[in-house]
Amino acid sequence: MAKYTIVDKDTCIACGACGAAAPDIYDYDDEGIAFVTLDENKGVVEVPEVLEEDMIDAFEGCPTDSIKVADEPFEGDPLKFE
C-alpha cells in the first residue's frame, strides 16, 4: 500500500533524528528544520517501498511527532494527519 510523508515544520526542533533514520527521505533546511526531499515537503509523492521501513523508523523516533505518515497524499491539506 502506498505511503506518503510530510514534516510539520512548525513543531520540528531540528534534532536530526529523522535524517539519521531515513537520510534518503528527510533532509534539513538552513535552520536545521527537516523536510521531505522527495517532493519538497508537499506530501504528494509516494515513498518508495524500499524506503518505507526507514520512514516508519523516523516517524516512530521523532520526539515531537512532527513526522506525519498517511496512506493518501496530503494534497489540499498539507497537514492532514493520519
UniProtKB/Swiss-Prot annotation:
Residues the entry annotates as binding [4Fe-4S] cluster: 12, 15, 18, 62
Cofactor binding annotation: Binds 1 [4Fe-4S] cluster.
Pfam name, any one: Fer4_13
Example of a GO MF term: 4 iron, 4 sulfur cluster binding
SUPFAM superfamilies: 4Fe-4S ferredoxins
Disulfide bonds: none
Domain 4Fe-4S ferredoxin-type: 3-31
Keywords for this protein: 4Fe-4S, Electron transport, Iron, Iron-sulfur, Metal-binding, Repeat, Transport
Entry cofactors: [4Fe-4S] cluster
Role noted for this protein: Ferredoxins are iron-sulfur proteins that transfer electrons in a wide variety of metabolic reactions. This ferredoxin may act as a phosphodonor to cytochrome P450 BioI.
Protein name: Ferredoxin
